[in-house]
């Protein structure tokens, strides 16, 4: 496997191997005074973030450094992009500089696929990892969500996962639907009709507009942020009405099964899609997701750049 561009790129075996190795990396780092493994020593990883990010950017950087890679961060404002350089020329420059992996977040859907095509050479070119492209996909987020569900519930297969909120603009939802289906989960989308994409009836999901009917049946609930920055208005009457209909309040949380887990990809709009008390409750796995993000991204880098399970943990 050369690139990770969409969650659909992952077979069940690939996804399971990445989740298993994420757990192995986590266990290998427990108790270490210096959190360093030699797995990617001598490799160069370049992150290219053209949209704001905290969790994804930091976790990729930490993942690379914990594996002893050289990690270089490139942003639009601090590079020749600010002078008008195209993404293609930037990509070719970074390939020529010797990058082993390019990790890209970009507002344009399909940018990672273009990057992979542009940087292909007689040696194969660098591996490209999609860290979020427009409203299209965010495959490593889906992997860390699946890992969190597996850790909390024992497995993903057969679990009922309810995804709530702004599905229309959510790359997280698209990647989660694909990966959770691959891993054998049942996926339910809950959203107002205006926040569901055209063609959603063709997805391997059940669609509902009634959150209260779905929560008691859920093993996991993934709350999505309303992405106002991608909207022109008119998708729902008001923030208050949205919260009343689709927010995970403390009262709604009480209808969840005791074993159910609450997830959120962040950043959270506390008080809108999720109540303060719910976000901080024992059922919430938000911080566990962040921690898992580092280990999953270590496993993804390993899977693409090394590939041999026997060498995953050394020294």
Swiss-Prot record:
Pathway: Pyrimidine metabolism; UMP biosynthesis via de novo pathway; (S)-dihydroorotate from bicarbonate: step 2/3. L-aspartate binds at residues 83, 171, 225. Carbamoyl phosphate binds at residues 55-56, 105, 138, 141, 266-267. Its EC number is 2.1.3.2. Disulfide bonds: none annotated. PANTHER family: ASPARTATE CARBAMOYLTRANSFERASE, ORNITHINE CARBAMOYLTRANSFERASE, MITOCHONDRIAL. Belongs to the aspartate/ornithine carbamoyltransferase superfamily. ATCase family. Catalyzes the condensation of carbamoyl phosphate and aspartate to form carbamoyl aspartate and inorganic phosphate, the committed step in the de novo pyrimidine nucleotide biosynthesis pathway. This is Aspartate carbamoyltransferase catalytic subunit. It comes from Mycolicibacterium gilvum (strain PYR-GCK).
């Amino acid at each position: 496997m050369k690139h990770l561009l969409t969650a659909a790129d992952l077979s069940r075996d690939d996804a399971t191997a990445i989740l298993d190795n994420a757990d192995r990396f986590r266990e290998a780092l427990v108790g270490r005074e210096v959190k360093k493994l030699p797995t990617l020593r001598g490799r160069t990883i370049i992150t290219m973030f053209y949209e704001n990010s905290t969790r994804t950017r930091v976790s990729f950087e930490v993942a690379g450094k914990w594996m002893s890679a050289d990690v270089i961060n490139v942003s639009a404002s601090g590079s020749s992009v600010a002078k008008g350089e195209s993404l293609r020329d930037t990509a070719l420059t970074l390939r020529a500089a010797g990058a082993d992996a390019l990790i890209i977040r970009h507002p344009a859907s399909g940018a990672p696929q273009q990057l992979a095509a542009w940087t292909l050479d007689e040696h194969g070119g660098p591996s490209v990892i999609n860290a979020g492209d427009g409203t299209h996909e965010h495959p490593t987020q889906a992997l860390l969500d699946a890992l969190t569900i597996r850790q909390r519930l024992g497995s993903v297969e057969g679990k009922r996962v309810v995804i709530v909120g702004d599905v229309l603009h959510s790359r997280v939802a698209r990647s989660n639907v694909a990966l959770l289906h691959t891993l054998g989960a049942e996926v339910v989308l809950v959203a107002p009709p205006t926040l569901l994409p055209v063609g959603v009836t063709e997805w391997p999901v059940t669609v509902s507009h009634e959150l209260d009917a779905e929560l008691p049946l859920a093993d996991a609930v993934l709350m999505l942020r309303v992405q106002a920055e991608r909207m022109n208005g008119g998708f729902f009457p008001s923030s208050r009405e949205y919260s009343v209909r689709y927010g995970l309040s403390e009262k709604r949380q009480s209808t969840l099964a005791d074993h159910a887990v609450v997830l959120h990809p962040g950043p959270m709009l506390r008080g809108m899609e999720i109540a303060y008390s719910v976000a901080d409750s024992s059922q919430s796995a938000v911080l566990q997701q962040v921690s898992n993000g580092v280990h999953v991204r270590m496993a993804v880098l390993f899977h693409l750049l090394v590939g041999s399970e026997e060498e995953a943990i050394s020294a």
